Regions:
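NAD(P)-binding Rossmann-fold cofactor-contacting core
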Residues: 24-42
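Electropositive, gly/pro-rich neighborhoods at or near active sites that engage anionic ligands
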Residues: 101-295, 407
Length: 408
């Protein structure tokens, strides 16, 4: 009799799982995925379902085909699925689970897990010279600390654009989860990255030297990131005569081992908009500041709502919508790579614009004491499993703040 299983995930890693399964012994009833756009479609000829519906289905095991599986385990447990039914494929300790012997070709599982570990070690050794504080002769870009960056924003009123890993991938022609790549987008991002302006600064990732301040998982991620999107490529994009500021100002909590200073950063941000009229330009369902006190000290708040995904395709309309508003307002942007370019263009037009990215979600995680990226109720959380919220809620005050919807 065959064992009925569900495979969680429809990415490249799921192909490794399929390859390692003894198909004579198992039946794949369905794939599950948090991307709601995939629900009801076929993957490898098999139905893709919403993970919420798994509790209604008959199966023996859910095989998690995701390397960073811990949050998925919590998600499934939260749905009421029993722990003994949850099998993270990339958990090395899985080899001790005797009841799975008939399901997998163990040598393939061991090979996959072994290769992942070896790759991490090789990349760590490759990056080690740049992480060593004793080696000074290697060039690394000048990136100011979070405190210095926040002081600039509070004391001088400059505008800021931020570059994360997603923006660099887009420059390299690689799309990211919520934004397709394009030649125009890449060229505009490169323009902002090299720009020099008195009323605008640029934040980049502080990952070119020591990584010890970040969580272990993030250290591994950035080593691999610098390997895949190599240093030489990134250095070629930067202006070596330019001082860069810290893009992590909007991520002061979840990424760091020492989280005790995050509160100071959030308080500094509140000083940026204290007593001001603000205009928030955000994605649909982002709901910046709703349900918390992040903007309780502003004088007034208006919003322009834009698409959560592929917002750059509506760039001209979004820019035009902002330019119709009063230049005396502080413009807060939470729109991925579109915000990076928008802050630069608005600064040239005389607006005060701040790319605040994930600050609201980070603040929510800080308030709840989260230790990993988790979905936040009623807010689009693209980096957390189950975070592609598309629910409808009634929020009269929020709706009254909306002055325009663009591209929706």
């Amino acid at each position: 009799m065959k064992t009925d299983i569900i495979i969680f995930g429809t990415g490249k890693s799921s192909e490794l799982v399929l390859d390692a399964l003894k198909m004579d012994n198992v039946t794949v009833n369905a794939f599950a995925d948090n991307n709601f756009n995939k629900h009801g479609t076929l993957y490898k000829g098999i139905n893709v379902v919403n993970p919420v519906d798994l509790i209604k289905m008959e199966f023996s095991f859910v095989i998690i085909a995701i390397i960073k599986y811990h949050s998925v385990v919590k998600q499934l447990l939260g749905y009421g699925i029993k722990e003994e039914k949850i099998v993270p494929y990339f958990d090395i300790d899985i080899i001790d689970n005797n009841k799975l012997t008939d399901m997998f070709f163990w040598e393939r599982m061991l090979r996959d897990n072994y290769n992942i570990k070896i790759k991490k070690i090789e990349i760590k050794l490759e990056n080690l010279p740049y992480e060593s504080v004793s080696i000074r002769e290697l060039y690394t870009p000048e990136v100011k600390g979070i405190t210095e960056t926040m002081d600039m924003l509070v004391d001088t009123g400059v505008s800021i654009s931020r570059f994360g890993d997603g923006e660099m991938k887009l420059i390299a022609g690689k799309g990211i989860g919520f934004q397709k790549a394009s030649g125009e987008l890449a060229e505009r991002l490169k323009e902002v990255l090299k720009s020099q302006s008195e009323n605008h600064i640029t934040g980049i990732l502080d990952v070119f030297g020591s990584l010890t301040k970040y969580t272990d998982g993030l250290q591994d991620y950035f080593r691999e990131y610098l390997h895949d999107y190599n240093r030489e490529f990134q250095y070629g994009l930067l202006n070596i005569n330019k001082t860069y500021y810290n893009a992590f100002i909007t991520r002061p909590y979840i990424s760091y081992k020492d989280k005790q200073h995050a509160g100071e950063v959030f308080e500094s941000f509140k000083k940026v908009w204290d007593g001001k009229n603000i205009l928030i330009v955000e994605g649909d369902r982002t709901r910046l500041g709703r349900g918390n006190d992040l903007f309780n000290n502003v004088k007034s708040c208006k919003r322009i709502i834009c698409p959560n995904e592929n917002a750059f395709e509506k760039y001209g309309q979004i820019l035009g919508a902002v330019k119709k508003q009063d230049k005396g307002m502080l413009v807060l942007l939470a729109l991925g790579p579109t915000a990076t370019i928008l802050a630069y263009d608005l600064a040239k037009e005389g607006f005060h614009a701040v790319d605040i990215g994930h600050i609201d979600i980070e603040y929510e995680w800080y308030l709840m004491g989260a230790t990993e990226k988790i979905a936040v109720k009623n807010k689009y959380t693209n980096e957390a499993y189950g975070g592609n919220s598309h629910d409808s809620i009634e929020d009269k005050e929020y709706e009254e703040q909306v002055v325009e919807r663009v591209g929706l």
